[in-house]
From Swiss-Prot:
A motif ('HIGH' region) lies at residues 40-49. This is Tyrosine--tRNA ligase. It comes from Borrelia duttonii (strain Ly). Residues 341-405 form the S4 RNA-binding domain. Disulfide bonds: none annotated. ATP binds at K230. The gene is tyrS. InterPro entries: aa-tRNA-synth_Ic, Rossmann-like_a/b/a_fold, S4_RNA-bd, S4_RNA-bd_sf, SYY-like_C, Tyr-tRNA-ligase, Tyr-tRNA-ligase_bac-type, Tyr-tRNA-ligase_bac_1. Belongs to the class-I aminoacyl-tRNA synthetase family. TyrS type 1 subfamily. Its EC number is 6.1.1.1. Catalyzes the attachment of tyrosine to tRNA(Tyr) in a two-step reaction: tyrosine is first activated by ATP to form Tyr-AMP and then transferred to the acceptor end of tRNA(Tyr). Its main location: cytoplasm. Keywords: Aminoacyl-tRNA synthetase, ATP-binding, Cytoplasm, Ligase, Nucleotide-binding, Protein biosynthesis, RNA-binding. It is found in: Cytoplasm. SUPFAM superfamilies: Alpha-L RNA-binding motif, Nucleotidylyl transferase.
Length: 406
């Protein structure tokens, strides 16, 4: 197997390939152009999107040429893959803004200065003539075959709109255009994209005669059954305005023990020998491996300086030491404090809980601390005198810390 593919296989990235042997031979012979696509359905990507872009970084390190494709056009349709119902149709203005923010996020992670492209498929999709598209592209698609793919089979039971049914044709056309414009030979995506990717490979092969390939990656799950990329605060976004760098670091610092080695392979560039060494310990000693994992992935997404700050803040919060200023904080307006404020109200205001009832349950269970002192009274109030040097430390359970600042 080609060296680049061996690296991906060893690290747990490979799931399915349209023709692994031929792809390996091609990659032995030349450096290929490949692409990863992502739709602009949100203002930010989350960590569930990271896997294909980690693969992109690995292949780029081996000299292959990446294309980041932002779906400014396909987002107007909505991909039914992995969805139980039709996606909300977004306004064009919102999609355009999402394209800008997602592009900015990805260019912080992937350096294209030495070769590569970032493109928006709206460039060729927005101006399509529907009749011509059906004549030039639609003739290569079999409805029977499309309905054989899991995405469509599952959705047919609950209702599949015609607009979504068109999505596979558009994604396939993307591959055709990238093959024609940039000599792109490989599309990479999550395994839920298998049907779309295979259809794209077939379209390119049949319409242009070019030999291209598709490669899918496993959908990553956690050993505790929680969905990858979700936390108590919601999605773990890559945008630090939506999800702080500290919380991003803490998400990976607090993964289950059983996931440490797997995530070190997936989310870092550490060598195999080092991963095996640092992940071979058990119990409390495994915390060091979690800290390394959290630092490495935070460095990739947010940069080394921000990773150092997050690491320092975590040590200050849980072990003492410098870095306290980098612990996340909530600014409490004096108008909210007045003479005093109930702790349960403050917890809701600071968004560490979603409701007063949740705050009361946490207090009753002994999981709430003010300046390292456990609070056992649901009616506990805070006044200005509690804010020594203008702040207090609110701790929820063992892992969540927030500075409340006046």
């Amino acid at each position: 197997m080609n060296l680049s593919l061996k690296v991906l296989d060893k690290r747990g990235f490979l799931k399915q390939c349209t023709n692994l042997e031929e792809l390996s031979t091609l990659m032995d012979r030349e450096k290929i152009v490949f692409y990863v696509g992502v739709d602009a359905t949100s203002a930010s990507l989350h960590i569930g999107h990271l896997i294909p872009f980690m693969v992109m970084l690995h292949l780029q390190r081996q000299g292959h040429i990446p294309i980041i494709l932002i779906g400014g056009g396909t987002t107007k349709i909505g991909d039914p893959s992995g969805k139980d119902s039709m996606r909300k149709i977004l306004l064009k203005e919102d999609i355009d803004e999402n394209v800008k923010t997602i592009s900015s996020q990805l260019l912080k992670i992937i350096d294209l200065s030495n070769g590569g492209y970032i493109l928006n498929n709206a460039e060729w999709l927005d101006g399509i003539n529907y009749i011509e598209f059906l004549r030039e592209v639609g003739i290569y698609f079999s409805v029977n075959r499309m309905l054989s793919f899991e995405t469509y089979k599952r959705r047919l039971k609950d209702g599949l709109s015609f607009i979504e049914f068109n999505y596979q044709l558009l994604q396939s056309y993307d591959f055709y255009m990238l093959s024609r414009m940039k000599n792109c030979k490989l599309q990479i995506g999550g395994d839920d994209q298998w049907g779309n990717i295979v259809s794209g490979v077939d379209l390119v092969n049949r319409k242009s005669g070019n030999k291209v390939f598709g490669l899918t990656l496993p959908l990553i799950t956690r050993s505790d059954g929680k969905k990858m990329g979700k936390s108590e605060k919601g999605a773990v976004y890559l945008d630090s305005e939506l999800y702080s760098v500290y919380d991003f670091y803490q998400y990976f610092r607090n993964i289950p023990d059983l996931d440490v080695k797997k995530f070190l392979y997936l989310f870092t560039f550490l060598e195999e020998e080092e991963i095996e060494r640092i992940a071979s310990v058990k119990g409390q000693l495994l915390n060091n491996a979690k800290e390394i994992l959290a630092f490495e992935i935070t460095k990739i997404v947010h940069g080394k300086d921000e990773a150092l700050k997050a690491s320092s803040a975590a040590k200050a919060a849980f072990k003492g030491g410098d870095g306290r200023a980098d612990i996340p904080f909530f600014k409490l307006e004096l108008t909210n404090l007045e003479e005093s404020i109930l702790l349960v109200d403050l917890m809701v205001l600071a968004k560490v809980v979603s409701s007063k009832s949740e705050a009361r349950r946490l207090i009753d269970s002994g999981g709430v601390y003010i300046d390292k002192v456990r609070v056992g009274d649901q009616n506990y109030c805070l006044c200005k005198d509690n804010f020594i040097n203008g702040e207090i430390e609110l701790k929820i359970g063992k892992k969540k810390i927030l500075r409340i600042v006046l």
